[in-house]
């Protein structure tokens, strides 16, 4: 858990620093002031939104490529064998029922039962399953998992969470810069440029706000997970989806799913304390099963 938070903060700080330098070198802030937009907070908010959304959309645009590289996923271009043929045809069948373009289909080598979907557009997505899923699940259970991933694509969850991340990034950047400027000018009486007080306060505020932002993003991720379960129940059948989740309860906890894909997988890291649950991308499996049991067949 601490590693995930540290990676989030490090990435957020790196994006802010790099994009801030680039935009300042391009003279964007000076241009805005010359156009009469000299209200400091307005300029700062524009910068925050640009930086906040840029990082999210760059990650989204690269998501398929990065997912394939990080997971070592091998795309199925020409199915080899009955199992790969079944996998491709199952994805195609669900995609057609949802009215979306055929996603790329891939398999990655991992012992745990898991799968993920990613991609910038509904009609150009990627659905990947682990070798452990194909080896340890029945066809009915695997079908439900595939339906879950196709539902993520059909619901546009990748773009939705990217927009949410962009919004929270904007406020993290904006509020941390406001705090830094306040301390720099009011406490250290520095009216020219950004002194040490600004940088120390800004980075500290960004770390604190980044943790809160992660909690917000994970809250929405958990909500989208319930919706994907419901979509899978519609596509594959409620009982199949419940059976798949029951199988996941008895499976090995996923360890090597990168955070970028975990939110769109079928199985996330198990929670412990109430605090840890706030950072979970997936609801507890028991809650997901109970939600499906309350859904009409």
Curated annotation (Swiss-Prot):
<feature type="active site">
    <location>
        <position position="149"/>
    </location>
</feature>
<feature type="transmembrane region" description="Helical">
    <location>
        <begin position="158"/>
        <end position="178"/>
    </location>
</feature>
<dbReference type="Pfam" id="PF01435">
    <property type="entry name" value="Peptidase_M48"/>
</dbReference>
<keyword id="KW-0997">Cell inner membrane</keyword>
<dbReference type="GO" id="GO:0004222">
    <property type="term" value="F:metalloendopeptidase activity"/>
</dbReference>
<dbReference type="GO" id="GO:0005886">
    <property type="term" value="C:plasma membrane"/>
</dbReference>
<dbReference type="InterPro" id="IPR001915">
    <property type="entry name" value="Peptidase_M48"/>
</dbReference>
<feature type="transmembrane region" description="Helical">
    <location>
        <begin position="41"/>
        <end position="61"/>
    </location>
</feature>
<comment type="similarity">
    <text>Belongs to the peptidase M48B family.</text>
</comment>
<keyword id="KW-0482">Metalloprotease</keyword>
<keyword id="KW-0812">Transmembrane</keyword>
<feature type="binding site">
    <location>
        <position position="225"/>
    </location>
    <ligand>
        <name>Zn(2+)</name>
    </ligand>
</feature>
<dbReference type="GO" id="GO:0006508">
    <property type="term" value="P:proteolysis"/>
</dbReference>
<keyword id="KW-1133">Transmembrane helix</keyword>
<keyword id="KW-0645">Protease</keyword>
<keyword id="KW-0479">Metal-binding</keyword>
<dbReference type="InterPro" id="IPR050083">
    <property type="entry name" value="HtpX_protease"/>
</dbReference>
<feature type="binding site">
    <location>
        <position position="152"/>
    </location>
    <ligand>
        <name>Zn(2+)</name>
    </ligand>
</feature>
<dbReference type="GO" id="GO:0008270">
    <property type="term" value="F:zinc ion binding"/>
</dbReference>
<feature type="transmembrane region" description="Helical">
    <location>
        <begin position="5"/>
        <end position="25"/>
    </location>
</feature>
<dbReference type="InterPro" id="IPR022919">
    <property type="entry name" value="Pept_M48_protease_HtpX"/>
</dbReference>
<protein>
    <recommendedName>
        <fullName>Protease HtpX</fullName>
        <ecNumber>3.4.24.-</ecNumber>
    </recommendedName>
</protein>
<keyword id="KW-1003">Cell membrane</keyword>
<keyword id="KW-0862">Zinc</keyword>
<keyword id="KW-0378">Hydrolase</keyword>
<feature type="transmembrane region" description="Helical">
    <location>
        <begin position="196"/>
        <end position="216"/>
    </location>
</feature>
<keyword id="KW-0472">Membrane</keyword>
<feature type="binding site">
    <location>
        <position position="148"/>
    </location>
    <ligand>
        <name>Zn(2+)</name>
    </ligand>
</feature>
